[in-house]
């Protein structure tokens, strides 16, 4: 099996690092395309031994599982470019926030009648094999296609299938969740420093506290509120700290953050549907170079046989 990434940014880099660390894929079985070969993430992929190219079409030709790892507003343009190269063997996995299965299928069906599309939402902790991933399969994807993706993503953390209408909300929960945690850790460390704890130690202790709390929750059947209560002694320091958090609207802020991320995800889908790109986004993503077909760099591997090693499409069955 070979895996391709259209887009060589943070997500592609994290997944490639996770897959190789887990031992499920060798670096030479991975290819990523980017119009900009000077990106730090491209350099990191190169050091891993991942094949690199400027041509999105070459990425399609050299892969079986194809991850669309670009910004949502770029997806329609990418699909127009690569659609003619997508074959029956390909599993097209969209990782773009808000981009629906139907919108990807509609674009690809202009080139072939039954594209196999899966929508996926993961997060950056896949790099340390502690990711949180959900996916939903499209109209023409086989049951085996979903299981193959689940096997791949389970090697870098937790992965489960969900109904597609949950994915926008999950984007706000676990997709954006690591950013909330990093902000909280930064603030916790600042609090420690304010009270005299050295910065390095404050960061380590804060991170360990959150890691331990998460592991306690995952290893138990207790409600988070019960585990919180277990830390609070009557009249103690922790309950006073929690009262201060409550007075600042701590819970409401987190709830509203998940909601805001979910709403923005749906806005991004609307932009993608309209094939609308703001001037700032156009400049940032170098859209004119995304469509540029250039010769591949020297690390490009020879073409694969075009068949998945772990499944036989002829034996697959469509999802009921």
Curated annotation (Swiss-Prot):
Protein residues bound to L-proline: 164, 237-238
Enzyme Commission number: 1.5.1.2
Residues with N-acetylserine modification: 2
Keyword NADP (UniProt): yes
Residues that bind NADPH: 8, 10-11, 34, 36, 56, 70-71, 97, 230
Pathway connected to this protein: Amino-acid biosynthesis; L-proline biosynthesis; L-proline from L-glutamate 5-semialdehyde: step 1/1
EC class of the enzyme, as a word: oxidoreductase
Gene Ontology terms describing biological process: cellular response to oxidative stress; L-proline biosynthetic process; proline biosynthetic process
Catalytic activity: L-proline + NADP(+) = (S)-1-pyrroline-5-carboxylate + NADPH + 2 H(+); L-proline + NAD(+) = (S)-1-pyrroline-5-carboxylate + NADH + 2 H(+)
Assembly and oligomerization: Homodecamer; composed of 5 homodimers. Interacts with LTO1.
Family in the record: Belongs to the pyrroline-5-carboxylate reductase family.
Name assigned to this protein: Pyrroline-5-carboxylate reductase 2
Species in which this protein is naturally found: Mus musculus (Mouse)
Gene: Pycr2
